[in-house]
Design a protein with these regions (language model features):
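Beta-propeller fold recognition
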Residues: 1-140
Length: 140
């Protein structure tokens, strides 16, 4: 039995953010960010790009969340997007994330101008080290 607000398909508006149906395999959401108006949500899904992983965008339509598209991390087929922070201060959101290697992973960014937006590597951790999260900090 479905409960009120539960999605019935990938394109059905939902009161819940549900990454099921956004690719193949089991969805694996690991980080998220909402714009200040709570009308746009980004979910970092650590599946490979070929399986639907990347940064998924959802839009609030007034009744529920609707999947828009996935920003696929294609700089490496073996790397996935993990943690997530977003800057909504400009005309287009700028998203920052870490990748999922256990050593020598990356901090990446992408400006969301649509589903074909390209990622840029900002930093690579030294061998034996890894970035484990990402967040904004105020300047002193």
């Amino acid at each position: 039995m479905a409960f009120a607000g539960a999605p019935t398909s990938a394109s059905t508006p939902s009161l819940f953010l549900n990454t099921a149906g956004t690719g193949t395999g089991t969805a694996s959401p690991v980080g998220f960010a909402f714009n200040p108006a709570m009308t746009v949500a980004y979910i970092a899904d650590n599946r490979s790009s070929s399986s639907g992983g990347g940064i998924q965008r959802f839009n609030w339509n007034g009744a529920g969340w609707v999947y828009a598209y996935t920003l696929a991390y294609t700089l490496s087929s073996s790397k996935q997007v993990w943690e997530l922070a977003a800057d909504f201060s400009g005309a287009s959101p700028v998203l920052y994330a870490t990748t999922g290697e256990s050593s020598a992973n990356n901090v990446v960014c992408v400006t969301d101008t649509g589903s074909a937006s390209a990622f840029t590597i900002l930093a690579t951790a030294p061998t034996g080290d890894a970035f484990r999260g990402i967040a904004f900090a105020p300047t002193p």
